Amino acid sequence: MDNDKKHVIPREQYRRKRHEYFHNEEREERLEREREQRERLAKKEQEQAKVNEERVKDNMRKARIEKLTQEEIHQQQHLAKLRSDNESDQELNDTNTHHLTLPEEQQLKNEHKENNDKVTKPTDEMEKQEKEDNNSASSKHDEIEPKYSRVEKNKGKQKQDNINKSEVNHLDKSEQTKKHKETKESSEDVLETNKSQKIEQKEQKASSNETSNKELNSYTKDKNNKVEDNQDLKKASSQNLAHSNKLEENEHLENEPKNNDTMDKVKDFLKLHWLKIVIVVAIILIVILISAIISTMNQNSSIEQSSNNDTKYTTTMKNAETAVKSVVTIENDTPKNITTQTIDKTNINSNNEVGSGVVYKAVDDTFFILTNTHIVGSNKRVNITYDDDKTATATVVGRDMWSDIAVLKATIKNKNMQPIKIGHSKHLKLGESILVVGNPLGNDFKNTVTKGIISGLNRAVPVDFDKDNKNDEWVNTFQIDASVNPGNSGGAVVNRVGELVGLVSLKINMPNIEGMGFAIPIDAAREIAEELEKKGEIQYPNTGIGIKNVSDLMPYERNLLKVPEDVQNGIVVEKLKENGLGKKSGLKIGDVVVELDSKSIQNNLQYRQIIFNHRQDLKTLSAKIYREGKSQEIRIKLK
């Protein structure tokens, strides 16, 4: 090719690729689903056709069997009838032949021959040949023997039997042909109905019809053979039946004396052992009576148990009536403002003037009353109301702010006043039933009794005693759900046997909170009361330090004191009293105390609680502190 000429591809050689259209996957999936659905439907139709074909075959078999059985029954009945007729005819012939003369016997033979000729005409060729042979044989015997002998009589009997047999065979064959025709007609009717119902499955039905016809023909042939065999067996069966009937009669006759023997044996047994039988029946009756008595006793015990439950309630009422006689109303000289100490940053009894008290001890006419410190306040004398609006003046024997326990003493000459029975709070159980007796809202609702349970044990509740909006100490209490209202403070908490187990002191008074009251355990209250009776006050150890909570420190204060970052709880020493126990123990300002007496300290309330718990033994306590960011151990003295 020349370089100057432009290279051009002829158009007939230029074959542009055909544009490939977008491959529609959804359409192919839809077509595939439709194809699979058609295949499933075709498969179901084939299965249904097979099922229908099997049903048709079963119905045809059942129809054939029913028809053949019915025909066989009719045939057997007919054969039995013919046999009975033949036997009766033979008996008549036997009787007649003995009384007939020789000419009469010859005439009877001729009649039998004519009857044989008439019967054998409609039979088959094989039967004709057999009869011709029999006739020829009989004729030969007739020529040899004399005509009027006993042999001729026997031959006549044999001929009559042969005639009857030929009749029976002829009837059997005619009935068999009828059966075959009827079975064919029934099968054709069934096939026609099936063809009308299943036009789409002609080929399958045709094949099924052919097989069914073959089966039917084979079955009919077998049945015909069986019928011929049964004819021979029926003779033997009839003989067996007669024999069996005779045996049954004999057995029945033998069993009658046996039954009589058993009845006699039963009667003899009853005569011999009647006493034992009576004893056994009596024992059974006694057992039944005992079981009935036990069941009634169980019912009575259940009734008694329910009545015991009622008596428990009655005991509760008695306990309430008894406790009411030991509870008094306490009023101090300050203006009336009926409240109750609370824990919601406001006090239940802000002015501390009206509440309740419990008489726990009596010496002659002198009664000792247990109440709360926040009711008595700083007064030395208070007014009490008891019985039916009777009043008296009580002297304050002692008070303890930290435990909220005060003891009063009053001289009262009244037989209705009596000290309450004291129990033990260490035996209290969660969920135990209790009664609260007090004077809510003063004398207007005095001797009010409410019922509840112990909702919690060992509750440490923070309380503000000096009204500076700062909690001063944790008070050890147990929680109750009985109704506690202003004026119930100092009231009695009574257990189910009427014993004093606590002294009402606090309640939570916050929105959406109900039924959370707290009582001081009687064991702790009684210990404080005994000490107040002796000394008039409670002396607590004082370490002589001013403290602040670590959680209240500002970030710059933590940096100045070099408090480690992982220390979030504890107390910081802010002040030290000259010659105080804290300074003598080696504490310095800025020390951070995190452990005391092997217990972690959360705040100043817990520090004070641990110190106060050792008010009697005053032992030296080990402490862990941080000083300048370094931890060390020291020992704090309490005396």
From Swiss-Prot:
Molecular functions per Gene Ontology:
serine-type endopeptidase activity
Highest taxon of the source? Bacteria
What is this protein identified as?
Serine protease HtrA-like
Q: Which residues cross the membrane?
A: 277-297
The record's comment on protein family reads: Belongs to the peptidase S1C family.
Q: Where is the composition biased (Basic and acidic residues)?
A: 1-13, 21-75, 106-187, 195-205, 220-235, 245-262
Record membrane topology: Single-pass membrane protein
Supply the InterPro entries for this chain. Chloro_Bact_Ser_Proteases (IPR051201), PDZ (IPR001478), PDZ_sf (IPR036034), Peptidase_S1_PA (IPR009003), Peptidase_S1_PA_chymotrypsin (IPR043504), Peptidase_S1C (IPR001940)
- Per UniProt, residues of the PDZ domain are 527-629
Report the EC code(s) recorded for this entry. 3.4.21.-
Query: What is the organism of origin for this protein?
Result: Staphylococcus haemolyticus (strain JCSC1435)
Compositional bias (Polar residues) spans?
Answer: 206-219
**What CDD domains does this protein map onto?**
cpPDZ_BsHtra-like
* One GO CC term, this protein: plasma membrane
Compartments in which it is found = Cell membrane
Q: Where is the active site?
A: H374 (charge relay system), D404 (charge relay system), S489 (charge relay system)
GO BP of this protein: proteolysis
Keywords assigned by UniProt?
Answer: Cell membrane, Hydrolase, Membrane, Protease, Serine protease, Transmembrane, Transmembrane helix
Give me the ranges of the annotated region Disordered.
Answer: 1-262
